[in-house]
């Protein structure tokens, strides 16, 4: 038994020596960080090597003196006992129960970051090993199995802790089972950061619970939020609940990130990381209040990045992000105003009313000559009328005065400063004249004067609403205003009401909702007037004389001329309007017929006047026509309009004429001739007697007897043959064979007959022309034969 106890004590002392070496390595770094940050650890957290050894030895003696409980405990009993131990603390139920610092220790190669939860009776395993005589190897194996058993039990009770935020902080023990056996439950309750009875542990709670002092796994380049967070615990446990919400949420950030975030905060930009840091985090920095002459946002940034050993200023550790002060906002306004003045001086629209004068010698103003002004300006903008400006400050002040005056005029107010006289425009009774800046309302019948710009805005809104009401066709009178209309039912009653401003309407109402209703009534009334009707309400007196429905019921009058019809429903208007439309159409048609008859009678009188004028013409024209016909020969011709084949093609389709008689001699006028064309079918042949023939020169007709038509002499026989028409027919047959081919399908089988017919027609036309040229002395035989072509169907 003594050998077993010595073996256990040796293992325990070896672990203590390693722990003390680690603590000695970490103490200088802890002291340096505590001096830099100005914080101290509590005595509960600062565990030195000597005190820990003494406390653990006392606990070991107490465990040996305690009676032995039941050695056989199931897994469920161990879980229940561990939960009862964890929830025994009064601080485990609070939301800030994880604020007690836990001392992590280096454990190379460890895989779990959650230490094992100790049992309420850690001496059970020691007593079992002392009472039972087992070889050392068996005892060591049993010890390892129970260690694994406790680790699996704690893993079942807790959520997984391998999260990205906890990968850089591995704080298990080398032999948590041995430390749990010889360490008291109270001491482990202080060092354990999972004291809550619940089984929902989150990485954020672990980060809140851990402190940076004993952490040896953190690298020099990275500082987690838990490493830069120093908690000052008080004696009262309830003070933890009074902390703001920002202290309950923390996130990991590196030292470089903290420095960059401080730079961003100093320049007025809020990074995303600093919004979730705790109060004590160095990344949560508030800009220091600057004096009045400095501008907000122009603070010089930090020169160097923060490192884990960089001292933190008190203003950086204990400060909140606050908006700029009133003095800073004033400096902002001054800077913006300065930039605005430069833009004001560069604006040509503002400077167009300023006239620069280089010297008083060029200026016509007597005041400038009296003062011997050199370079100065004159403002000719209304209402300055040539005000003298000699200094740059005066020019800037005057331009700003004009700008403010224009802005106030947009709101309906005239601005007057303390150096302006408002008496010429608004009388002598102003109490603010020559005293302070004030605003006069420019609207008619409005004597309001204000000093505050907020009152100006409110009064401008009143006039804006009033102008909207006027645009709708109404006028509003408030309770203190008099409408000056004695017939108004609200006259002298001090009631806000409305009047309709439309012509002939005296409607009044006090509810603004009735405005749209009355406006709709006027729109409908206008439409009825366009259709020729007028609607009278029951509440109105009918303007029509002797109307029996006046003030009795709603009715509609027809306002058309000569109509006294009264309608009682809007459905009757359609039929009544159609009746008037029909009557108007009949009247318009009658007027059109009368006008048309007058025009026809005037056209009939015109031909009679033309005939009388033609009869009075001299006979010289007829003599010239007879002489030209003698020179041209005895043949007669038709006008050019008759030479076309239009009338020839206009005849009825069928078989060609059976007989085509060739033209005979001009002297044998008594010979029979086949009438090729009816005179009634050719309107061009029927020339009116009153129409004079075209005068043709006798030489022209003699040179070209066959081409130019000769005027028909009154002494020529009308039965003489027309050679030009016959020649044209033959020529058309030669030029258009397809026409006859389509007209007479049988001709395709005897195409030579068409050529013979064309040749014969051409020969006869040439013979007739030669006979006409030889004169009347040469007699030609009477060629009277018939040509009858045969067609095979």
Swiss-Prot record:
Transmembrane segments: none annotated. Its main location: nucleus. Residues 650-662 bind DNA. One of its GO terms (cellular component) is nucleus. A zinc finger (C2H2-type) spans 377-402, 439-463, 498-522, 556-580. The modification Phosphothreonine is found at residue 211. Residues 44-101, 199-259, 272-296, 599-682 are annotated as: Disordered. Residues 44-53, 273-284, 630-644 have a biased composition (Polar residues). PROSITE patterns: ZINC_FINGER_C2H2_1, ZINC_FINGER_C2H2_2. Expressed in a specific subset of neuroblasts in the ventral nerve cord and the procephalic region in the embryo. Expressed in many, if not all, late delaminating NBs, and in early NBs, but only after they have undergone several rounds of ganglion mother cell-producing divisions. Residues 54-68, 81-98, 210-221, 245-254, 608-629 have a biased composition (Low complexity). It is found in: Nucleus. Keywords: Developmental protein, Differentiation, DNA-binding, Metal-binding, Neurogenesis, Nucleus, Phosphoprotein, Repeat, Repressor, Transcription, Transcription regulation, Zinc, Zinc-finger. GO terms for biological process: central nervous system development; ganglion mother cell fate determination; generation of neurons; glial cell development; mushroom body development; negative regulation of DNA-templated transcription; neuroblast development; positive regulation of transcription by RNA polymerase II. Residues 233-242 have a biased composition (Acidic residues). PANTHER family: TRANSCRIPTION FACTOR CASTOR PROTEIN MING -RELATED, ZINC FINGER PROTEIN CASTOR HOMOLOG 1. This is Transcription factor castor.
């Amino acid at each position: 038994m003594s050998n077993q106890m010595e073996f256990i004590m040796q293992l325990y002392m070896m672990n203590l020596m390693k722990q003390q070496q680690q603590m000695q390595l970490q103490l200088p770094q802890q002291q340096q960080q505590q001096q830099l940050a100005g914080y101290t650890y509590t005595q509960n957290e600062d565990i030195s090597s000597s005190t820990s050894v003494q406390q653990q030895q006392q606990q070991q003696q107490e465990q040996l003196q305690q009676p032995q409980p039941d050695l056989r405990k199931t897994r469920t009993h161990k879980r229940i006992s561990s939960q009862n131990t964890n929830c025994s603390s009064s601080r485990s139920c609070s939301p800030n129960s994880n604020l007690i610092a836990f001392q992590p220790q280096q454990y190379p190669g460890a895989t779990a970051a959650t230490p094992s939860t100790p049992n309420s009776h850690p001496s059970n395993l020691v007593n079992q090993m002392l009472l039972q005589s087992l070889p050392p190897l068996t005892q060591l194996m049993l010890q390892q199995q129970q260690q694994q058993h406790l680790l699996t039990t704690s893993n079942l009770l807790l959520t997984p802790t391998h999260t990205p935020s906890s990968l850089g902080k591995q704080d298990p023990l080398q032999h948590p089972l041995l430390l749990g056996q010889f360490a008291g439950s109270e001491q482990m309750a202080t060092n354990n950061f999972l004291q809550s009875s619940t089984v929902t542990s989150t990485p954020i709670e672990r980060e809140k619970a851990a402190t940076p002092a004993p952490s040896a796994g953190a690298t020099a380049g990275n500082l987690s939020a838990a490493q830069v967070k120093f908690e000052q615990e008080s004696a009262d446990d309830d003070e933890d609940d009074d902390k703001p919400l920002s202290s309950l949420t923390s996130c990991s950030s590196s030292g470089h990130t903290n420095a960059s975030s401080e730079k961003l905060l100093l320049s007025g930009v809020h990074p995303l990381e600093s919004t979730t840091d705790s109060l004590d985090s160095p990344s949560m920095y508030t800009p220091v209040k600057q004096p009045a002459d400095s501008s907000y946002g122009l603070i010089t940034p930090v020169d160097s990045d923060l490192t884990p050993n960089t001292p933190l200023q008190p203003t950086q550790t204990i400060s909140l992000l606050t908006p700029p002060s009133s003095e800073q906002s004033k400096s902002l306004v001054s800077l913006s105003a300065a930039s605005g003045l430069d833009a004001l001086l560069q604006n040509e629209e503002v400077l167009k009313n300023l006239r620069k004068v280089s010297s008083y010698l060029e200026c016509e103003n007597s005041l400038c000559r009296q003062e011997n002004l050199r370079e100065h300006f004159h403002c000719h903008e209304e209402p300055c009328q040539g005000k003298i400006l000699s200094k740059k400050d005066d020019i800037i002040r005057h331009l700003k005065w004009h700008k403010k005056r224009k802005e106030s005029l947009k709101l309906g107010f005239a601005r007057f400063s303390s150096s302006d006289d408002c008496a010429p425009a608004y009388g002598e009774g102003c109490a603010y004249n020559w005293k302070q800046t004030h605003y006069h309302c420019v609207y008619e019948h409005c004597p309001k004067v204000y000093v505050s710009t907020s009152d100006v805005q409110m009064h401008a809104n009143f006039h804006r609403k009033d102008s909207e009401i006027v645009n709708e066709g109404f006028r509003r009178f408030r309770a203190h205003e008099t409408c000056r209309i004695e017939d108004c039912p609200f006259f002298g009653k001090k009631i806000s009401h409305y009047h309709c401003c439309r012509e002939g309407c005296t409607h009044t109402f006090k509810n603004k909702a009735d405005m749209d209703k009355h406006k709709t009534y006027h729109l409908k009334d206008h439409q009825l007037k366009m259709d020729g009707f007028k609607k009278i309400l029951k509440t109105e007196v009918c303007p029509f004389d002797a109307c029996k429905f006046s003030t009795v019921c709603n009715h509609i009058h027809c306002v058309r001329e000569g109509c006294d019809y009264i309608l009682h429903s809007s459905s009757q208007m359609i039929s009544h309007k159609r009746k008037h439309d029909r009557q108007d159409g009949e009247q318009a048609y009658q007027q059109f017929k009368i006008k048309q008859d007058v025009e026809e009678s005037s056209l009939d009188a015109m031909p009679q006047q033309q005939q009388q004028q033609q009869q009075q013409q001299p006979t010289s024209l007829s003599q010239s026509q007879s002489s030209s016909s003698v020179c041209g020969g005895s043949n007669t011709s038709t006008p050019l309009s008759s030479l076309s084949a239009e009338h020839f093609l206009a005849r009825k389709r069928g078989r060609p004429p059976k007989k085509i008689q060739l033209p005979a001699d001009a002297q044998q006028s008594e010979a029979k001739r086949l009438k090729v064309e009816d005179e009634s079918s050719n309107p061009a042949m029927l020339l009116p007697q009153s129409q004079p023939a075209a005068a043709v020169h006798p030489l022209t007709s003699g040179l070209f007897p066959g081409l130019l038509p000769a005027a028909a002499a009154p002494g020529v026989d009308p039965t003489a043959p027309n050679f030009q028409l016959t020649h044209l027919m033959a020529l058309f047959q030669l030029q258009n064979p397809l026409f006859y081919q389509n007209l007479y399908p049988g001709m395709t089988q005897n195409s030579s007959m068409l050529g013979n017919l064309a040749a014969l027609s051409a020969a006869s036309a040439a013979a007739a022309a030669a006979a006409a040229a030889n004169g009347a002395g040469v007699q030609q035989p009477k060629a009277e034969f018939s040509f009858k072509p045969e067609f095979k169907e």
